[in-house]
Amino acid sequence: MSRRLGIMGSGSGLERRARCPGSAHLPSAPDTNEASAQGTANHEREEVAIDLGGVKSPVVELALRGSNVHQTEVAYAVDVETGTARQIGAKLGRNYGDLSPTEIPLTVDLVCLDTSAVWDWKSRKRVADPTENYQLRLAGYAAAKVNGWDSVTVGIGYLSDNAHAVGTMTSLDMDVLLADLRAIYAGLKAAEASPASHLATGPWCEYCPAMAWCPAQTNLARAMVGELEAAVGQIEQWTPEAVGRAHVKLKAFEDLAERVKKAIRLRAQREFIPLPGGKKVLAMSEQSRTSYDAHAMAERLSDLGEDPKKYMKTTHFAKLMEKKA
């Protein structure tokens, strides 16, 4: 047993390991930023509301409908070799303790024991639907195995706008997941000797802790810079179709540039980065921002008999968007 994660990592990174097995064998560093800190705060607010009976987001109320016995922040471990699962504890803060090399730990935001359901909260950005989402499938599998369920409801709740997506996993779906997990494990083992030949870029790169050391990202950046430089000053002479193709490439480049920024930030978390000229260095600096808690203010206004919508303001602006032709 070990306190370190095995090559399968944790449940939240399972999609990336399935798509890009080489990334599991590169150096890595966690990415901490304002967005992730806010996401953690949103999760904690809902957790406290569930546990202590406070005001909850509508999507959380929906998830709890019909349930009187539930737990928050439940930690499990699934063994891909044996197919077994165990509950490690609750509210552990990702401190999973001793794990075997073939175990995958994960934390489930909400487990409804009397309705056989698991839920994961997301802040805003959409992810794959529950029955196609490795993290949610693993959560459903773990809870079902530990609690003896033949089927389990798996749900994602988006806290920013109270949208949700729900699916069901049957015992057959669980068998399929276990086969998938074993295939992922085999792929990761095969990538150990030559990680660079088992890399693949895609949406899963966004939060990859190995991005700063990834040769696939370096090669992609070099190719795209040359293509976009050729477009400078020529847009007016191009056909509309060529401009459309340039727009698609630009979007991909912007996504890549954002990932490079994150990689630089990860490196700067570990050491000062000297800038050209020798007079400045790039370094991480702790910052804070104070703002009103809109959620709390809306609750307070409602308590006072005021409609929070009276105090909303709409700002109009133009935005370049893709629409159906």
Regions found by a protein language model. Give the residues of each.
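Short, polar/flexible loop-turn hinges at active-site or ligand-entry regions and domain interfaces
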Residues: 29-35, 125-128, 193-198
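Glycine- and acidic
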Residues: 27-28, 120-125, 237, 241-245
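Short, charged, low-complexity amphipathic alpha-helix
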Residues: 179-251
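Short coil/turn segments at secondary-structure boundaries
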Residues: 27-29, 199-206, 312-315
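Mg2+/Mn2+-dependent nuclease catalytic core
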Residues: 72-192, 313-314
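Metal-dependent nuclease catalytic cores that hydrolyze phosphodiester bonds in DNA/RNA
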Residues: 1-117, 144, 151, 165, ...
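Extended, charge-rich alpha-helical segments
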Residues: 84, 248-251, 255-325
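Charged, terminal alpha-helix-loop-beta segments
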Residues: 69-73, 163, 211-213, 217
